[in-house]
Amino acid sequence: MKNSSKLKGLLTVAATAALFTFSGTAKADYPEKSVEMTVLFGGTANTIAQILSDLLSEELGQPVVPVARKGGGGAVGYTYLQSAAADGYSIVWNSNSINTTYHTGRIPFDHTAFTPIARISTEIPALAVNSSTGWSSLADMTAAANANGGKLKVGISGKGSFTHLTSAAIFDAMGISDKIIYISYGSGKAPIELLAGRIDAAIQWPGQ
């Protein structure tokens, strides 16, 4: 209960900070109406966003409504928010995708178009393989890639996504970047394909 109270306090501060970040003319009794929170992805991001919106709604006394705006690795949601009024009533459940969408040319603006108001969670992508492969280390995977003379199929969220960039860096360091075929599955689908044996490995967020 103590941790819950601390979290609620942090979220209240975060929402208040959004007021000062997005609007120079907002009133002290903010919010006077519902706040719309853009959610860019499904999976873990959506789960956390739903919990966060419930807590914020309770603390602020106004509905904080999560709205899914998926697509383009986050580009759809970021573009919407960037054009919305800077009055504190439009916020986004952000992620590192703001960097990848900019550098892959999907949006003409970068993270400086927004001001972060709170860090709620952190998550690191995980590389997983089907246990039937018998691989238990990166060395095992490297040996398999070099031995079969073919390509390894690796599931990612999408081309240019953070999972794609992470896996590219890993496989480059392993010396097998030329033996990888990337398959884009969107949010949370790669682990299912991995368990079904249709791909050799997947890089996804642990929550998925």
Feature roles, as predicted:
Residues 12-21:
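Bacterial N-terminal signal peptides
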Residues 28-113, 151, 159, 173-208:
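N-terminal (or domain-start) structured segment
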Residues 157-166:
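Secondary-structure junction motif
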